[in-house]
UniProtKB/Swiss-Prot annotation:
Lineage: Bacteria, Pseudomonadati, Pseudomonadota, Gammaproteobacteria, Enterobacterales
Name of this protein: SfII prophage-derived bactoprenol glucosyl transferase
Gene Ontology CC annotations of this record: plasma membrane
Main localization of the protein described in the UniProt heading: membrane
Gene name, Swiss-Prot/TrEMBL: gtrB
E.C. numbers: 2.4.1.-
InterPro entries given in the database record: Glyco_trans_2-like, Glycosyltransferase_2, Nucleotide-diphossugar_trans
Organism: Shigella flexneri
Amino acid sequence: MKISLVVPVFNEEEAIPVFYKTVREFQELKPYEVEIVFINDGSKDATESIINALAVSDPLVVPLSFTRNFGKEPALFAGLDHASGDAVIPIDVDLQDPIEVIPHLIEKWQAGADMVLAKRSDRSTDGRLKRKTAEWFYKLHNKISTPKIEENVGDFRLMSREVVENIKLLPERNLFMKGILSWVGGQTDVVEYVRAERVAGISKFNGWKLWNLALEGITSFSTFPLRVWTYIGLFVASISFLYGAWMIIDTLVFGNPVRGYPSLLVSILFLGGVQLIGIGVLGEYIGRIYIEVKNRPKYIIKKSHRGNP
């Protein structure tokens, strides 16, 4: 039985040797043929040469190198495209997702699950801000989007070959893999685990990238941000109508003069701000449509070696 590990890497020269050694020395994976698909996402350090060297000595290492940095989501998709295992497991190279969890994922899969989620029961290794923003994102996403995504589940999971083939059929260029992996469906099971500290290096995923990923997740699986502006428009129009009616009554019945420029200026600025926000939301969706219709590839591979080059 063949198990494929899909491992996106970006400037991870310190972590790759530790990860490889840990996988190959882990006794509970010895009964399986374990393929490791490294996807080098445009690294500037020695990452590419390290994974190519591993492939020379180990035919079960598949090194893929992008021509530039395309991002983690395209890297994951490339890994799924090139993984050949009966089951495929995306996993981070930093070993925060422990190798020891993999046998439990395999056990659930062999019991009949199409997808086995690895759920973090403890995120104390993440900073407080990251934990809170992740909690807010999951709650917001699951309120307004379909399908819902399991809270505290990242990319670390096991997928059957059938699920992987279904994912590969999806044509979109704007990728939010957590949503895509949930969208394909199938019988799902969960394994809980405690997230560990990084074995080497530092995280390359900063706050700005997390913000963009959150936007991608919401705009890829929900039209609520567009629909909400209909309700905002109705609300503003209703308030404006009531305020206008009150001004007429106040003038005709009570004889008070019409208020001057301050109220007019505030109204114009308020409506202008509302319109700009609405245009911004609309622009986010139009921009994604623009990217999709150009039909560019999700990624471009510079080098691919299986075994000896």
